[in-house]
């Protein structure tokens, strides 16, 4: 079905929005956002408990409200009246709950999503398009379909008027009627929950569509592209062959470093650009407004207030709580969010590093719970991701997915379980381990000290798992689909041993 090209209207809006962003004082805007949120929630149970009526500054707020995690909110505020949260931490009744993938803990969480948050997410999606047309003056992004490779759009009723589902499903359900022809999939196909069936059907139908943009998690997009390769001619491997009018590939959710070389290969010869976003079930944080290595611009005016805690202080009783007015560049921070859905100084679980403050741009560096220190080596998620990406590039391979964990035999070592494309030889696998080892030693003094002379720990080892192994494992856990992510680190030795057994790794 032909789609009326609405890109000229988008371009007109983009000129206005970009002018506003150019004049924005992000620090002042963040303070305005906080005081607006506090004022809105003063009548709630949480607002009364924390004296919101007296909060007049960032300092007042940080004095009144401690840092909390999901479990703290769940036990003290949400669980007693779940699923009907009325004037609990946000005014009115919460109509939606986003089901978090529970990447770190493995436990599915119900994250409140208010009507205000739905609108904030819609504004963030429009900002993404604004930055695209700003970088592509000849864009015709709305001349075809925008492909959202997400979870099921079907929502589960929890109570009358209250629904739960994947964040992507909540977004798909809110697309207005006039915009639906510009999005793919929709209708029954969008509501399919079985990922394997959905992938096969989407691949076949998408080849008949004029796809202009595509969004999803990198690992699941690669699985989808494998399905396309089974349908398309053998030489039709680049994305530009499958989707000749593709302009933008939107990725987020995990570090792009291990996938960069494979996507560069897929995008070769096409007119498409890769654009990173930082969405979360708790709110949309940032969008790449420039090139791939120039950071993501923080959304300072979109219903969220951000705090930043130095990662090495997160476990302390009284950590330093920065905000945009006091944050510094080149330091690692854990992200803390206050939102228009009733989250207050909520520890998001991600870590970032600012590369600029005027305007604020950052890199997502990992998860605050995503690290490995089974032997005192204190590796961060970012260091592991970068080492794996460099090692894969060194052997000419592409990583589809991987996880790493400790093995407590002898001095102990790290074992990397990696799904490569194409398959690799024993010699390549040995070279992969050598590069991972040397990169980590260069990046982390504690790791280098433990590896010196093999005294503190043995060299890392790697096992190449069969194609589809991680997808099969996720399916067995009931977590197959674009909203879920393979955990990069399984730090618990017993849990990692069980995973190895499931993947038939000895």
What are these regions (language model features)?
Residues 1-53, 61-65, 76, 82-83, ...:
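Active-site glycine/GP-rich loop and adjacent strand/helix microenvironment
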Residues 28, 32-97, 110, 120, ...:
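Active-site diphosphate/adenylate-binding microenvironment
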Residues 97-104:
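Conserved helicase ATPase motor motifs in RecA-like P-loop NTPase domains
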Residues 105-106, 369:
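A broad detector of the eukaryotic-type serine/threonine protein kinase catalytic domain
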Residues 106-116:
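Short "domain-exit" segments at the C-terminal end of structured domains
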Residues 117-124, 298, 380:
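Short acidic-hydrophobic sequence patches enriched in Asp/Glu that either
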Residues 131-179, 189:
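Conserved AMP-binding loop of ANL adenylate-forming enzymes
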């Amino acid at each position: 079905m032909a789609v009326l090209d609405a890109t000229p209207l988008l371009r007109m809006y983009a000129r206005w929005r970009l002018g506003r962003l150019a004049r924005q004082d992000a620090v002042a805007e963040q303070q305005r956002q906080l005081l607006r949120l506090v004022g809105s929630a003063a009548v709630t149970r949480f607002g009364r408990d924390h004296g919101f009526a007296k909060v007049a500054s960032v300092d007042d707020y940080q004095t009144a409200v401690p840092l909390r995690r999901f479990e703290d909110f769940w036990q003290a505020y949400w669980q007693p009246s779940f699923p009907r949260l009325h004037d609990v931490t946000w005014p009115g009744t919460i109509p939606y709950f986003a089901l978090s993938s529970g990447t770190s803990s493995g436990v599915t969480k119900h994250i409140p999503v208010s009507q205000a948050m739905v609108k904030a997410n819609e504004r963030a999606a429009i900002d993404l398009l604004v930055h695209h047309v700003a970088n592509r003056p000849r864009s015709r992004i709305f001349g075809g379909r925008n492909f959202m490779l997400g979870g099921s759009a079907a929502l589960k009723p929890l109570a009358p008027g209250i629904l739960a589902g994947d964040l992507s499903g909540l977004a798909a359900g809110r697309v207005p009627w006039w915009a639906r022809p510009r999005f793919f999939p929709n209708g029954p196909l969008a509501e399919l929950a079985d990922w394997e069936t959905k992938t096969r059907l989407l691949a076949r139908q998408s080849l008949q569509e004029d796809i202009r943009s595509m969004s999803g998690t990198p690992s699941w997009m690669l699985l989808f592209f494998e399905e396309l390769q089974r349908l398309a001619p053998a030489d039709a491997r680049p994305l530009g062959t499958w989707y000749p009018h593709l302009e933008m590939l939107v990725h987020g959710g995990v570090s792009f470093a291990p996938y960069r070389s494979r996507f560069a290969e897929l995008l070769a010869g096409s007119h498409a650009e890769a654009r990173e976003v930082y969405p979360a079930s708790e709110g949309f944080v940032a969008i790449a407004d420039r090139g791939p290595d120039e950071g993501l611009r923080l959304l300072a005016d979109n219903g969220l207030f951000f705090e930043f805690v130095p990662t090495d202080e997160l476990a302390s009783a009284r950590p330093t709580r920065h905000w945009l007015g006091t944050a510094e560049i080149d330091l690692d921070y854990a992200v803390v969010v206050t939102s228009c859905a009733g989250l207050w100084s909520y520890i998001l679980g991600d870590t970032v590093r600012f590369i600029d403050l005027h305007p604020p741009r950052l890199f997502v560096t990992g998860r605050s719970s995503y690290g490995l220190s089974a032997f005192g080596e204190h590796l961060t998620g970012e260091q592991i991701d970068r080492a794996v990406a460099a090692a894969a590039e060194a052997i000419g391979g592409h990583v589809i997915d991987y996880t790493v964990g400790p093995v407590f035999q002898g001095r102990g070592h790290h074992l990397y379980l990696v799904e490569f494309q194409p398959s690799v030889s024993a010699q390549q696998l040995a070279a992969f381990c050598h590069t991972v080892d040397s990169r980590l030693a260069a990046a982390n003094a504690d790791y280098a000290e433990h590896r010196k002379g093999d005294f503190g720990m043995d060299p890392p080892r790697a096992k190449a798992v069969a194609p589809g192994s991680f997808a099969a494992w996720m399916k067995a856990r009931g977590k197959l689909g674009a909203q879920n992510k393979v955990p990069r680190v399984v730090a618990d030795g017993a849990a990692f041993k069980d995973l190895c057994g499931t993947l038939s790794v000895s």
